[in-house]
Every structure is written in C-alpha cells, then in structure tokens.
C-alpha cells in the first residue's frame, strides 16, 4: 500500500489549548471499538471518570455538557484523558483529527482538513506549489493510475501561474467535463444558507453576499494573495475529486471550483463591510466553509446533487 501526503503535512502541529476553535467543543466525538474496550477496562477512580464521560450507543461517543464541551475537556482546554494517560489513550478520531484520508486501490492519500484553524493557517501561508510525497511500496493498479493522471491535469491547471485564478478555474471545468450552474455569488450563498449550519455565525457570514460587494476593489488588492486561492483550489481537488473512488468526477471538480470561488466572494464581502480583510480573517473564512460544508455529510451530498 502506498501512502502519500502534501509536502506541508509534516509541518502541522496541534496548538492544543491555544486553539480558538477547539475541536473538543461542539462536536460529538464517536469512539471506535478498540478504544471503547480499553476505556471499559480502565481501573480505579479515573476509569470510572472516563466511563461516566461516555454515552453508550452504536457507536458510543463522549458526552457534551450544556456548553457543548466534551466531558473530558479541562477548563484549560486540554484533554484530561491525554494529560493523564498519554496520546496513545485517545480514540481514533481524537488522535487523527484534523487528518482526512482518500482511499484508492493500492493507494491512500492523507491530508489536513481546513475545519482546523491551524491547518487552514498552514495551508494559506504556503507559497510553494503543492507536491505529494510519501512511501511508494509498489505501482498502483491501472484504474488508480488513470484517475491520478486525470487529477494531475486538473492540478496542473490549478497551479498554472501564467493564468489568473479565474482563468485556471475556467480551464479546470471543461477538462473535468464539468460545468457550474450560472448563478451569482449571492444566489449560491442563499443555497448554502438553506442547508443546516454547524456553527453559529455561518448563516450571517453568507448573508453578507446579499448586500452590495465591491469585487473590483477586492480584485485589485487580492492579487497579492492569489497563491492563497491557488492553495485552496488544490486542496479541494485533492480532498474531494477522488474521494468516492472516481465516481461523480465532474460534480466533485465543480465543487472544488465553486468552493474556491465562494471563499473569494466571501473575502470580497468582508472587505466591503470592514474596509479590509486580514490574513487571519481569510483563514477563518476557509475554516468556516470547511466546518459547515465539508464536515457535514448531508451538506456535501446536497452540494454535489446541486452540481450534478
């Protein structure tokens, strides 16, 4: 089995208690079978403490308090389980987050999800073109090679710096046999606002596109940040294009383009409202998009259906 990951992957470090959007708050964390067995066998008072924090079910999950905080999260925003027993005691999701995986025949690709603010900051701060690295054990089967070659054509277009961002996106769509319904950013914002929000403030963020937006002014200043949108476009292609083993390729390519275009539009809306939009604000927009769209199976399904 070959495992590949973006070159920046190894630079990721969790910011733990310093994180403003703690992944132990607001998320119902499922517990894998092996971890559940391990927690059930923990001895002593701490074992009782852990078991009291687990809600039985299929699968079981950690309880959330009235503020949406995991029952194992301390007041200093560090995990009591990890601090007491070490990282090896964490369940799979807690140990793995914000990593995602794309599984192909003979190949697994690993990346960092943008719902994590540190992963988003790391991605948007990169100016180098994205390359994949890892351990290649043997050549993948032909069907995987064909999918990878197809995706590489789209990645090459996404990173063709002779073209504007818009030119790259317009090139990707026909290469993928895809098209976007002709709608304004305001109309697309209304569509995404009709889906279930996962975080407070998301609907209000989308609503900014219902007001007049100075795209011309944003285009002039955002030229200096074009690599940020290139990184986003590449990220969405890597994460989603082959996520279903090559099914729904046109819709998934269109989703990558639409996601990048919407983040550009949301940046323009933020600048119109405030007169400026900082790097930190652009990171937060990427995180919000990821948390409210990518990390909801229902919302992803609705978006892909809309693009099919």
Model-assigned labels for residue ranges:
Residues 14, 84, 144, 249-253:
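Short, charged/polar micro-motifs that form catalytic or ligand-binding hotspots
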């Amino acid at each position: 089995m070959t495992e590949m990951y973006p070159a920046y992957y190894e630079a990721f470090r969790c910011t733990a208690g310093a994180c403003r959007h703690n992944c132990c708050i607001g998320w119902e964390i499922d517990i894998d079978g092996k971890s559940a067995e391990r927690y059930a066998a923990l001895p002593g008072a701490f074992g009782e403490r852990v078991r009291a924090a687990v809600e039985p079910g299929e699968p079981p999950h950690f309880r959330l308090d009235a503020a949406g905080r995991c029952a194992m999260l301390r007041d200093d925003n560090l995990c009591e389980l990890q601090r007491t027993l070490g990282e090896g005691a964490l369940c799979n999701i807690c140990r793995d987050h914000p990593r995602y995986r794309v599984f192909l025949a003979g190949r697994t690709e690993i990346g960092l999800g943008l719902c994590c603010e540190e992963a988003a900051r790391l991605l948007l701060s990169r100016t180098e073109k994205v390359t994949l690295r890892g351990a290649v054990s043997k050549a993948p089967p032909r069907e995987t090679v064909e999918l990878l070659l197809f995706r590489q054509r789209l990645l090459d277009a996404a990173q063709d710096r002779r073209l504007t961002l818009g030119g790259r996106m317009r090139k990707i769509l026909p290469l993928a046999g895809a098209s976007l319904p002709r709608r304004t950013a305001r109309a697309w914002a209304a569509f995404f606002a009709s889906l279930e929000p996962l975080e407070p403030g998301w609907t209000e963020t989308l609503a900014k596109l219902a007001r007049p937006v100075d795209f011309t002014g944003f285009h002039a200043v955002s030229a200096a940040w074009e690599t940020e949108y290139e990184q986003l476009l590449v990220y969405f292609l890597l994460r989603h294009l082959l996520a279903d083993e090559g099914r729904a390729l046109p819709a998934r390519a269109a989703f990558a383009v639409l996601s990048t275009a919407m983040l550009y539009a949301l940046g323009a809306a933020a600048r119109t409202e405030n007169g400026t939009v900082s790097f930190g604000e652009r990171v937060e927009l990427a995180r919000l998009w990821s948390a409210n769209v990518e990390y909801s199976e229902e919302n992803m399904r609705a978006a892909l259906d809309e693009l099919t």
